[in-house]
Amino acid sequence: MNKKLNYEKKGPKAVILFHAFTGTPLDVNTVGKALGRENYTVLMPTLDGHDEEDPNEILKCGIKDWVKNGEEAYQTLKADGYTDISVFGLSLGGVIATHLMLNEDVKSYGVFSSPVISTSKTNVPKIFWQWYAFKMKKLGAKEADIQSKQSAVMNR
């Protein structure tokens, strides 16, 4: 399990909330707080490569890593004795929640703005590279270096 785990133990019903691609648990924090007020145990893991100062960390990870983070979060709750577990996710987090719904004994699940299969182009790559450039410029990277990294990744 990654080191960044927001876990508030309350009642016997547990919910795992997964954040979006390039996001953090802050993406789902409002929902988590509301559930906590209703006596739900809430676990909001930070997916590998996310919430890092260096945006290159996210490029070291992929869907298999994030699904593994989801499975580890689920197993954390099971190991702590929870049997009534629900999973919800935003965007990428919804993909992880869906994986858990299909492969684990979850009570309920939900997705918010999750990716679907599309035959047309999406804006996800464009938005990602805008985010990446913004983060790298904050670290002092030059535009040429950012473009070089983008080309290297896109041509893998």
What are these regions (language model features)?
Residues I16-T22:
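The conserved beta1-alpha1 loop
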Residues E53-D84:
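Catalytic nucleophile-loop/oxyanion-hole region of alpha/beta-hydrolase
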Residues S86, S108-G110:
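Residue in the alpha/beta-hydrolase core beta-strand immediately N-terminal to the catalytic nucleophile
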Residues F88-G93, A97:
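Gly/Ala-rich beta-loop-alpha elbow adjacent to hydrolase catalytic centers
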Residues T22-G32:
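The serine-hydrolase catalytic nucleophile loop
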Residues M1-K13:
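Short beta-strand-to-loop junctions in surface cap/lid or active-site-entrance loops
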Residues L35-D54:
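Conserved alpha/beta-hydrolase
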Residues S113-R156:
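The alpha/beta-hydrolase serine catalytic core
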